[in-house]
């Protein structure tokens, strides 16, 4: 199934696109968010966003301590399903035990 045909997934502290835009302090009008997870726990925050724009797939990763938030960290990097799959299966993507931002299993299911 094409990712664009799936219902967007918002996990943990995010429930919609507006929450993502507010936390990053950025305009997301031309962004099609596909999958987003953010957790703020023990004075630290960790975020991951997968989105489509102009037919290309991008991801944004952000993190912060208690002093700041995600503002100024909206720095999209182009990605592929293959790259995400590799990082999910061979690395530790989506398995953050410090901030509790656990989204690896959900992202694996979403992109397959």
Predicted regions and their residues:
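Low-complexity intrinsically disordered segments
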Residues: 1-12, 22, 75-112
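Compositionally biased, low-complexity repeat tracts
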Residues: 15, 40-43, 58-59, 65-68, ...
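Amphipathic, interaction-prone secondary-structure segments
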Residues: 22-64
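Intrinsically disordered, low-complexity regulatory segments enriched in Ser/Thr/Pro
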Residues: 54-83
């Amino acid at each position: 199934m094409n990712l664009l045909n799936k219902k967007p997934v918002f996990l943990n502290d995010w429930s919609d696109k507006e929450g993502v835009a507010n936390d990053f302090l950025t305009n997301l009008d031309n962004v099609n968010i596909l999958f987003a997870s953010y957790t703020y726990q023990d004075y630290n925050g960790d975020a991951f966003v997968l989105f489509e724009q102009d037919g290309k797939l991008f991801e944004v990763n952000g993190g912060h301590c208690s002093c700041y938030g995600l503002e100024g960290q909206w720095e999209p990097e182009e990605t592929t399903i293959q790259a995400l799959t590799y990082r999910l299966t061979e690395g530790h993507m989506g398995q953050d035990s410090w901030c509790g931002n656990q989204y690896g299993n959900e992202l694996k299911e979403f992109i397959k």
